C-alpha cells in the first residue's frame, strides 16, 4: 500500500491546497508514535481486518482521536475485526466494512452532487470500481454525512457467498 500512499501524498502536495501530506517510512504503525502528534488528519491505507495496523494500537490511536485529529481510511483499511476494533471504528468514523455483511463488487454507480461543501465544483460522475456497500454504520447514521451514494445493480447480488463477495443479509436488504 506504500505506493498508493505515495501517490496520494504527491497529489495532495501538488494540489495547491494548504496541506502537507507526509508518508511515514515505517511499515505498519509508526515506531516513533510522536510523528503523529502534529498531524491534523491521519490517512490509513493498509491491509484490513485481522491484518489492520490499528488492531494492536487501539488505545494509542483512540487517544489521538480524542484529541480531535481527523482520520481517513481507504479501501481495505475500512475493514474491522468484530469487538473492540469494530466498536472503535464506529466511534471514530461512524461505520466500517464488516466482512460477511458488507460487500465490495465492481460496479458503476452514478454519483450526483449533494448539498455539502465537499461537492463544490464537482459535477456528477461515475467510475467502474470496487465500491463497497452494505456497510455497518452507527444507529440512525448519527454524525455521519453521506457524500457518495447510489443503489447498486441487482447483478452485484449474484456472486457466491464469501467474506467480501455476497451473503444472505445483503441479498435480503
Question: What kind of feature is each model-predicted range?
Answer:
Residues 2-80:
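Helical hinge/lid and interdomain linker segments adjacent to catalytic or ligand-binding clefts
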Residues 13, 98-173:
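Catalytic beta-strand/loop cores that center a nucleophilic Ser/Cys/Thr
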Residues 19, 90-91, 165:
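Short, charged/polar low-complexity linear motifs in solvent-exposed/disordered segments
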Residues 28-30, 85, 173:
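Short, functional N-terminal and low-complexity linear motifs
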Residues 47, 92-93, 130, 163:
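Short secondary-structure boundary micro-motifs
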Residues 51-124:
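A glycine-rich, often tryptophan-bearing local segment used as a flexible ligand/cofactor-contacting loop or short
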Amino acid at each position: 500500500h506504500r505506493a498508493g500512499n505515495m501517490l496520494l501524498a504527491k497529489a495532495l502536495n501538488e494540489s495547491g491546497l494548504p496541506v502537507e501530506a507526509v508518508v511515514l517510512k515505517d511499515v505498519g504503525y509508526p515506531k516513533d508514535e510522536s510523528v503523529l502528534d502534529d498531524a491534523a488528519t491521519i490517512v490509513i491505507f493498509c491491509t484490513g481486518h485481522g491484518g489492520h495496523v490499528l488492531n494492536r494500537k487501539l488505545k494509542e490511536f483512540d487517544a489521538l482521536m480524542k484529541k480531535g485529529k481527523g482520520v481517513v481510511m481507504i479501501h481495505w483499511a475500512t475493514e474491522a475485526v468484530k469487538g473492540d476494533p469494530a466498536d472503535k471504528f464506529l466511534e471514530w468514523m461512524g461505520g466500517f466494512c464488516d466482512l460477511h455483511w458488507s460487500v465490495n463488487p465492481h460496479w458503476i454507480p452514478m454519483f450526483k452532487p449533494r448539498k455539502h461543501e465537499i461537492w463544490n465544483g464537482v459535477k456528477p460522475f461515475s467510475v467502474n470500481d470496487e465500491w463497497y456497500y452494505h456497510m455497518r454504520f452507527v444507529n440512525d447514521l448519527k454524525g455521519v454525512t453521506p457524500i457518495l451514494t447510489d443503489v447498486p445493480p441487482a447483478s452485484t447480488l449474484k456472486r457466491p457467498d464469501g467474506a467480501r463477495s455476497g451473503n444472505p443479509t445483503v441479498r435480503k436488504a
